[in-house]
Regions:
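Beta-strand-enriched cores of mature, soluble protein domains
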Residues: 21-168
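Positively charged n-region of N-terminal signal peptides that target proteins for export
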Residues: 1-4
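Bacterial N-terminal signal peptides
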Residues: 6-15
Length: 168
């Protein structure tokens, strides 16, 4: 019985190795800088404790963005949804609009998880952004994968600074 099981395991692992060896290895992704934005936030609204954690929301008050091929303003009126989880991490989901200098309005939905490092310091915050652009000059944004890096923004106003990168 033991030899039958050992034989079956050996056959499965040998087959899996042979199959894996025949397949091409996916290329490592690279990043291309797209733009940096400074997003101003209004005073947050505490929703309270929910079954998922401590919920709050912060209205997006506006801002600016600039990159090599795209720049403009962050429109007021969006929201940054925040959930403080039981493990101390913060789930973030921002939904807002940007308007390019040439008049195109683009929806941004940006999500992240912000956690502290084991020594209690703020850890790096990486985001995943989805853009919804109208057909035309910026519709390439609808077909790409984007990640971002988020840090606190200008100390004079409550804001965050995010650098967006296209994954290639």
């Amino acid at each position: 019985m033991k030899s039958a099981i050992a034989g079956a395991v050996l056959a499965l692992t040998t087959s899996a190795s042979a199959i894996a060896a025949d397949r091409p290895v996916p290329p490592d992704p690279t990043l291309e800088f797209v733009f940096e934005e400074e997003v101003a936030l209004s005073a947050g609204v505490a929703v309270g404790t929910t079954p998922y954690g401590g919920r709050s929301i912060a209205p997006i008050a506006g801002g600016t963005f600039k990159g090599p091929e795209i720049s403009g303003t962050v429109l007021p009126g969006g929201w940054d949804w925040q959930l403080l989880r039981a493990d101390g991490c913060l789930d973030l989901k921002a939904d807002y609009f940007i308007k390019t200098d040439d008049g195109v309005t683009i929806n941004v939905v940006n999500t992240a998880v912000a956690c502290r490092t084991p020594d209690g310091k703020p850890g790096p915050v990486r985001t995943h952004a989805v853009f919804e652009a109208p057909n035309g000059k910026y519709d390439w944004m609808n077909r790409q994968t984007f990640i971002g890096s988020l840090v606190p923004g200008d100390e004079k106003v409550q804001s965050v600074r995010i650098r967006f990168y296209r994954v290639k």
